[in-house]
């Protein structure tokens, strides 16, 4: 691994600690030794919508969380992180392809931080209106459904949880835990 990539992975890892173990998100590093993490598994606790089939009909229903994998390729940060929904069914949203791949509302820039990219992705899951891509959506059916129902204040945004960051003390504690062998790094005891 090139030094430049290692430096960037480490910088992103430390930034990601600012959103570790929040009410809306926990994550674990699943590929690469921290802080040189190349793949994250995110457990998201935000209310959203999914499309399901029952008795020959498709219906949109609420979901209360999902699991997402974030992969950083060897050519990262020149190529955007790949974000893939592992939960079935995936989120039903204009910025998410029906197979569960995230399509950001704005192009990736190598100067962008992974943390900010993940926060924008979380904003789409909770239907933040400023992040809905209507010009070139990944999922046209989801866009049609959203435009038909967006006036329903009870539905949108689908979750009013603020996407806040950890305090400096919480971030420092998360860093100590993440870099200490055998210690817990999230609330479920997963290392």
Each language-model region and where it sits:
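UBC/E2-like fold recognition across ubiquitin and ubiquitin-like conjugation systems
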Residues: 1-65, 75-191
């Amino acid at each position: 691994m090139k030094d430049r990539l290692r430096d960037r992975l480490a910088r992103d890892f430390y930034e990601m600690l600012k959103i570790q173990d929040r009410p809306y998100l926990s994550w674990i590093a699943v590929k690469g030794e921290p802080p040189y993490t190349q793949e994250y598994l995110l457990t998201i606790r935000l209310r959203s919508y999914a499309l399901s089939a029952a008795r020959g009909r498709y219906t949109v229903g609420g979901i209360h969380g999902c699991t997402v994998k974030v992969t950083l390729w060897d050519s990262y940060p020149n190529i955007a992180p790949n974000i893939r929904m592992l939960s079935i069914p995936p989120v039903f949203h204009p910025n998410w392809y029906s197979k569960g791949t995230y399509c950001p509302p704005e192009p990736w820039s190598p100067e962008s931080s992974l943390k900010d990219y993940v926060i924008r992705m979380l904003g789409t899951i909770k239907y933040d209106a400023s992040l809905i891509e209507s010009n070139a959506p990944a999922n046209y059916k989801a866009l049609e459904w959203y435009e038909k129902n967006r006036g329903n204040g009870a539905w949108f945004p689908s979750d009013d949880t603020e996407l806040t960051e950890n305090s400096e003390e919480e971030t420092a504690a998360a860093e100590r835990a993440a870099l200490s062998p055998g210690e817990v790094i999230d609330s479920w005891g997963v290392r």
